[in-house]
């Protein structure tokens, strides 16, 4: 699997500033649009490798935060990406990795699970 980052609801300017460096690192970029939210996460990242088991579209809330999903990366590449982003102030607060657990979820489910975790953690901090 080629390393890849999926972006959802992220600022195009940020993505365009990161694009050349990510390309030099051999990391691809995909923008996840509204029409892909009900596709499985694995299929959205790697359609040639994963089967799609889409959910029926629904009125599930669409989170409004910027999100990036790191796919097919080892620890070294992930750290390089995160360090580059931090040094260059390309902040995307919500990040996750493609895992064996979430690869079969719909993208919208992943976003809403992460959003629920964020809210729960914020409550615990208070």
Residue ranges, per PLM feature:
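Short, intrinsically disordered low-complexity segments
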Residues: 37-69
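N-terminal, charge-rich interaction modules
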Residues: 1-48
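Helix-rich interaction surfaces within compact, conserved domain-sized segments
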Residues: 3, 14-17, 78, 82-125
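Phosphate-end processing signature that detects enzymes handling 5′-triphosphorylated RNA
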Residues: 24, 28-30, 34-35, 52, ...
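Mid-chain, well-packed structural core segment of small domains
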Residues: 58-88
């Amino acid at each position: 699997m080629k390393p890849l980052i999926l972006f959802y609801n992220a600022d195009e300017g940020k993505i365009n500033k990161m694009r050349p460096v990510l390309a030099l690192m051999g990391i691809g970029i995909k923008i996840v649009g509204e029409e892909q939210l009900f596709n499985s996460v694995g299929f959205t990242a790697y359609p040639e490798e994963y089967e799609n088991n889409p959910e029926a579209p629904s009125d599930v809330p669409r989170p409004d935060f910027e999100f990036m999903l790191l796919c097919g990366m080892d620890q070294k590449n992930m750290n390089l990406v995160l360090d580059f982003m931090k040094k260059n102030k390309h902040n995307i607060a919500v990040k996750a990795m493609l895992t064996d657990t979430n690869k079969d979820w719909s993208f919208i489910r992943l976003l809403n699970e992460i959003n629920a975790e964020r809210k729960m953690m914020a409550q615990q901090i208070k």
